[in-house]
Design a protein with these regions (language model features):
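Post-DEXD/H (motif II) to motif III coupling segment of the RecA-like Helicase ATP-binding lobe
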Residues: 76-77, 81-82, 89-156
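Motif I (Walker A/P-loop) of helicase-class P-loop NTPases
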Residues: 1, 17-20, 101, 106
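Conserved catalytic network of the ASCE P-loop NTPase/AAA+ motor domain
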Residues: 1-3, 24-27, 49-54, 73-78, ...
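Conserved interdomain hinge at the start of the Helicase C-terminal
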Residues: 167-174
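Conserved helix/coil segment N-terminal to the catalytic DExD/H
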Residues: 22, 39-82, 90-96
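Conserved Walker A/P-loop ATP-binding site and its immediately adjacent core
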Residues: 4-28, 34-43, 62-67, 131-137
Length: 174
């Protein structure tokens, strides 16, 4: 049983998870892994072993993976130091049509804290979204308050994304 902390990143897209892990590895951060349905059994077993033995400090999974008893047992074996929710707007009404299992995340965290007896010191939760209007932000905050008695602190940036640049190229077609 590893005593090192594990950050669990919940993300809706397998390709995004893979890209994020690949980018971290490229930057020299070897402790990031993903477990998803696109992996073959050998890759999945290797990733699970890395999580279990503490070689992984960041685990990327989809919200649906939280319903797996195997994943539940794996996370029970580790010291979870934070849950990071990517694309948190999926908690809001329109996102629930897209990924209903986002609504299970709070139940999973509550059960994990109860089973691990960490209810007095809740596991921190961070939520990220780039597309949330005020109503969606309120939905996210209300969800975590109702499920975990957790009050989220909001950090908002400008809608202008100066780091993004677009170029339109004309292409001749036959």
């Amino acid at each position: 049983k590893s005593t090192h902390g594990l950050t669990v990143v919940i993300s809706p897209l397998q390709s995004l998870m893979k890209d994020q892990v690949d980018n971290l590895v490229e930057k020299g951060i070897e402790g990031a892994v993903t477990i998803n349905g696109l992996m073959n059994p050998i890759e999945r077993a290797d990733a699970m072993e890395r999580v279990k033995n503490g070689k992984a400090s960041i685990l990327y999974i989809s919200p649906e993976q939280l319903r797996s008893k195997t994943i539940e047992r794996l996370l029970m074996s580790r010291n979870i130091v934070r849950f990071v929710i990517d694309e948190a707007h999926c908690f809001s009404a329109w996102g629930q049509d897209f990924r209903v299992d986002y609504l299970y995340i709070g139940d999973f965290i509550r059960k994990l804290q109860k089973d691990k007896k960490t209810e007095r010191k809740p596991i921190p939760v961070s939520c990220f979204t780039a597309t949330a209007k005020q109503k969606v932000i309120s939905d996210i905050c209300d969800y975590f308050y109702k499920k975990l008695d957790l009050t989220l602190e909001i950090f908002a940036s400008k809608a202008t994304r100066e780091n993004l640049h677009y170029t339109v190229l004309h292409k001749e077609t036959d």
